[in-house]
Amino acid sequence: MPARARFNFAGFLACLGLFWIVAWGPTGALGASWDRPDFATSTLSLDRGDGTLLTYRVELATTPRQHAYGLMHVEAMDADAGMLFIFDGMAVRSFWMKNTLIPLDMLFFDDEGRLVSAVEKAAPGSLVSRRSSGPAKYVLELKGGSMQADGIGSGAHLRFPLGG
């Protein structure tokens, strides 16, 4: 390879490396801070589908930054804890497990709180996209295995208002 071509290729690699450091380095994805955002908390009631009410202590993810961070870097979770993602409208929702250290159950709910679909025991660190089977407004993430342990079935629905 001619010297000039090697130089251009080396320059390209250097620029690519610099971009990688700036975009995905310690400050996070394209400049977003890796610091965990503050989350409001609430009590969530969930009818598991047979009239039995379950209660969870949840962190509320309501902003794009909170949606992006979610439960990343959480090392342990109580059986009655979770995170409720609240979106502005209905859409097919897609989640992955990047930087998530524990298995999670993901429950997708429509704007009336009815269970649309669920993913059980999503593997930590997986980059596989987990999508709702239909439009959803809410996504509840619980400790992996909670759906089975708590008997949450296809007729499950959220109880509103939150914290009530």
Language-model region placement:
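N-terminal secretory signal peptides that target proteins for export/translocation
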Residues: M1-R6
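Bacterial N-terminal signal peptides
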Residues: G11-G25
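Compact, glycine-rich, soluble single-domain proteins
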Residues: G28-G164
